[in-house]
Amino acid sequence: MTAKIGIVGSGNIGWALKQMLREDYEIRQGDITDGFDASNIEHVKKFLTGLDAVISAGPFSVNKNIAGIASKEGIAYFDLTEDVETTDFIRGLKSKSILMPQCGLAPGAINICAAGMMEEFDSVSEVLMRVGALPRFTTNEMSYYLSWSTNGLINEYCNEADAIYEGKAVKLMPLEGAEKIVIEGESFEAFNTSGGCATMCETFEDKVENLTYKTIRYPGHLNHMKFLFNDLHLKKNKDCLLYTSDAADEP
């Protein structure tokens, strides 16, 4: 019997998930463009009926609804959220099924890789996680192409970043801590963003001296973001920021 998997969202990530899973599973996909509103509890209940698992590839704001109902119905739940508060909510749910948030590149794969490498050593003094989903070539002033959620990106850039400093869990300001990275002769910049550490600061507090996560971008991107978020105070007007970011990302 083929397992039934639901995918919430049919954007770039939702589309990719369907391509990867459709040959081995029965897929049900729902998106706001099809009339499925994941912020509506009744819509979510109907969508989840009969599923074995659900993957949320929608905005993080709908994940509490989906995870909450999945936990009650015993449906396995996965998402790719970077939102710390949403993750804490899901971790607090009780269910007989698997509830696994933060299954993306970062948080997700980068944390598995880092934790796996740490296990190879008797003691670890410093862990530096640096991740950037970048286009090979850029065509706009922001030197970036958004391949995932605009809401998620704004969330990463607005909220505090988790880190471990001198063995203790701390909070760092987003868009700060800039550093230069050179990869195969090409220069990049990296800076603090929220969510990338997942729960590592909780897991490894007092077990590692320093642990940080930063997002990699092409040079100049950070200055543009600081202008939008800080100088224009758009971090306090996220609707305007969302519109601006989407408009700038159009081809």
Role assignments for model-derived ranges:
Residues 82-99:
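Rossmann-fold NAD(P)-binding glycine/threonine-rich loop
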Residues 53-67, 74, 79-86:
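N-terminal glycine-rich "phosphate-gripper" loop used for MgATP/nucleotide binding
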Residues 243-251:
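Single conserved hydrophobic/aromatic residue that forms the stacking wall/gate
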Residues 122-241:
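Active-site-lining helix/loop region of Rossmann-like oxidoreductase modules
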Residues 13:
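Hydrophobic/small residue at the entry helix of a nucleotide-binding pocket
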Residues 31-42:
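Adenosine-cofactor binding site in Rossmann-like domains, unifying the SAM/SAH pocket
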Residues 10:
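Glycine-rich Rossmann-fold phosphate-binding loop(s) that bind the pyrophosphate
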